[in-house]
Amino acid sequence: MSRTIVALILLGLAALAAADHHEGHGAEKEWAGKAWLGKWVSTDRSENWDAFVEALGLPLAAYGGNHKTVHKLWKEGDHYHHQIIIADKSYKQDIQFKLGEEGRTAHNGTEVTFKYTEVGDNLQNEVKIPSKNKTISDSYVVKGDELEKTYKINDVVAKRWYKKHAHEPSTA
């Protein structure tokens, strides 16, 4: 009986190792080719952020202020990733998308749809929140090593600025 258990454990470990090996050698992350690809870390500079949070109907105590935010954008195979990290809020979300195609995800339990497009060298994203009957338009404009993200909901426009940082080396 113990040989059977040992064999099952070894088989399970081999399967896990094979799965890990396969994931690590899929399509490699591409960080170049589009101006907006890369790792972007927020600066202390923002404009009209609290008004934007209020227009969304979110509590300022939780979402107001200038929390350090990291946006990582990369291409992997035929799709892109947009990973958003807010460390002091223990928040991390990875959105996979194809340019021009609508996708779905949840943000803190609320269903949202999104559609990323490219206009010239700039990335655009339209986020719809059906339960709140709200639409957010995001624009990502790169100027040198700085990314200016503009958020718009109704007549409220907010901006935050990000600096480009070195991305992690690919694990593939």
Swiss-Prot record:
Taxonomic placement: Eukaryota, Metazoa, Ecdysozoa, Tardigrada, Eutardigrada
This protein's UniProt keywords: Glycoprotein, Secreted, Signal, Stress response
SAHS-c1: annotated span: 30-59
Organism from which the protein derives: Hypsibius exemplaris
Protein name: Secretory-abundant heat soluble protein 64681
Chain intervals for the UniProt region annotation (SAHS-c3): 115-164
Region of interest (SAHS-c2), ranges: 74-102
Signal peptide (from-to): 1-19
Presence of the UniProt keyword Signal in the record: yes
Null allele phenotype: Affects slightly survival under dry conditions but does not affect survival under frozen conditions.
Family according to the record: Belongs to the Secretory-abundant heat soluble protein (SAHS) family.
Positions bearing carbohydrate: 108, 133
Function: Secreted heat soluble protein acting as a molecular shield in water-deficient condition. Tardigrade-specific intrinsically disordered proteins (TDPs) are essential for desiccation tolerance by forming non-crystalline amorphous solids upon desiccation, and this vitrified state mirrors their protective capabilities.
Misc note: Trehalose, a disaccharide essential for several organisms to survive drying, is detected at low levels or not at all in some tardigrade species, indicating that tardigrades possess potentially novel mechanisms for surviving desiccation involving tardigrade-specific intrinsically disordered proteins (TDPs).
Protein location: Secreted
One CC-aspect GO term: extracellular region
GO MF entry, a single one: lipid binding
Induction or repression: Expression is highly induced during desiccation.
Note on domains (UniProt): SAHS-c1, SAHS-c2 and SAHS-c3 are 3 highly conserved regions within the SAHS protein family.
Principal place of residence: secreted
SUPFAM superfamilies: Lipocalins (SSF50814)
